[in-house]
Curated annotation (Swiss-Prot):
Pfam families, alphabetized: NAD_synthase (PF02540)
Binding site for Mg(2+): 52, 165
Keywords: ATP-binding, Ligase, Magnesium, Metal-binding, NAD, Nucleotide-binding
Keyword Metal-binding on entry: yes
Listed name of the protein: NH(3)-dependent NAD(+) synthetase
EC number: 6.3.1.5
Record carries keyword Nucleotide-binding: yes
Gene giving rise to this polypeptide: nadE
One of the protein's GO biological processes: NAD biosynthetic process
An example molecular function term from Gene Ontology annotations: NAD+ synthase activity
Length: 274
């Protein structure tokens, strides 16, 4: 029996959206969170140059601009952080994203020394890290840096998780999967594109082939190749449409595998994993 309806309900995906309304919904969500927590004045997000961080970043910037205007409190701001490992091959894309976002402040924190130091420390302890595992260390180090900045600036860390990513568990546990607030949650991949189009983004910012690009042995590996299923199929599934049995089984397999990522650390009272 297909899990489709249950998953759609859990992730809150609509079969169709009005982009302008969803932009407003995300902006109001971000603003309400900051207003509810008066000790928070900053939104922090790592910008990779991909669709998701570009969209979340622009939403964050617009949200703090509105708060400054509406409250008169000029201390609200958005900090965008570039977090390359060494030299990023598609740095030009990241710069184009920043030009669209127009953040109040941009920081660059190169994570290479921290990641390599961790790998070497593990090696000295007799633990040889695989390329895949090193990729997860990169993702977690990026979040360490974002939380360090947030901690020094009275900030909250934005996550870029959305429905098409959540359903497949295509994120690093306590890496990019760790954040304070998720303004894109409920949207699938094509709906995120629609929001960027509505916001006037250049097509190159949302038509770029999605890639986590964490593995050095597989540079630029496309998400769809890693997942074995297309975002078109994932989006159709999340919108309640019929897809091939093979694609459906693949998506639901990823859903089961990623259950542990969608929960806080397991307690004795949890039974979802049994």
């Amino acid at each position: 029996m297909s899990l489709q309806n249950d998953i759609i309900k859990e992730l809150g995906v609509k079969p169709t959206i009005v982009p302008k309304e969803e932009i407003r919904r995300s902006l109001d969500f971000l603003k309400a969170y900051l207003l509810k927590h008066p000790f928070l004045k900053t939104l922090v997000l790592g910008i990779s140059g991909g669709q998701d961080s570009t969209l979340a970043g622009r939403l964050a910037q617009l949200a703090v601009e509105e708060l400054r205007q509406e409250t008169g409190d000029q201390s609200y701001r958005f900090i965008a952080i570039r977090l390359p490992y060494g030299v990023q091959a598609d740095e030009a894309d990241a710069q184009k994203a920043l030009a669209f976002i127009r953040p109040d402040q941009t920081l660059t924190i190169n994570i290479k020394a921290a990641v390599d130091g961790q790998v070497e420390a593990l090696k000295a302890a007799g633990i040889e890290i695989t390329d895949f595992n090193k990729g997860n260390i990169k993702a977690r180090q990026r979040m360490i840096s974002q939380y360090a900045v947030a901690g020094q600036t009275s900030g909250a860390v934005i996550g870029t998780d959305h429905a098409a990513e959540n359903i497949t568990g295509f994120f690093t546990k306590f890496g990019d999967g760790g954040a304070d607030i998720l303004p894109l949650f409920r949207l699938n991949k094509r709906q995120g594109k629609a929001l960027l189009r509505e916001m006037g983004a250049d097509a190159s910012l949302y038509e770029k082939v999605p890639t986590a690009d964490l593995e050095e042995n597989k540079p630029g590996l496309a998400d769809e190749v890693a997942l074995g299923v297309t975002y078109n199929d994932i989006d159709d599934y999340l919108e309640g449409k019929e897809i091939s049995k093979e694609a459906q089984e693949k998506i639901e397999s990823w859903w089961y595998k990623g259950l542990h990522k969608r929960h806080l650390p397991i307690t004795i009272f949890d039974d979802f994993w049994k």
